[in-house]
Amino acid sequence: MAKYHFIIIGSGWRALYYVRVAKALPEIFCIDAMYCRTQEKADLIAGQYQIHTTTSIEECVAYKPDFAVVAVKKDAICDVSMEWLDRGITVLSETPAALDTDSLNKLYSYYKCGKKQVVAEQYR
């Protein structure tokens, strides 16, 4: 079985759950990169978790991942998800997918165009 290659957008506690899942199941998942907004955060995460981190969106896209995990602040998750859908990348986003009906309808329009987004919920 081929591994699923993915990138992670975000570096908070929810994003780090996906790092732990990938490390627990290396025969199934491979993290190509974690996108961080600052180099300081990227260096910190890379050192703590021994994964590749970057501040370059272009680098993340160049990996041609099977999907992108979007685990950012809830007020940004819809817009960030749409940015990655616009790049042609399937999105696995954390909840909430959107904060209002208009934003949810925008996400639905991506589905109608054949773009894929899956929403996940995790509990501590």
Predicted regions and their residues:
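N-terminal Rossmann-like dinucleotide-binding module
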Residues: 1-49
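Short alpha-helical
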Residues: 13, 40-41, 75-76, 99, ...
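General small-molecule cofactor/ligand-binding pocket signal
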Residues: 32, 52-54, 118
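Short, Asp-centered acidic motifs that coordinate Mg2+ and/or phosphate
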Residues: 33, 66-67, 116
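Beta-loop-alpha module in the N-terminal Rossmann-like domain of NAD(P)-dependent dehydrogenases
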Residues: 49-110
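Short strand-turn motif at the edge of the Rossmann-like AdoMet-binding core
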Residues: 95-96, 121-123
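Rossmann-fold dehydrogenase core element
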Residues: 105-122
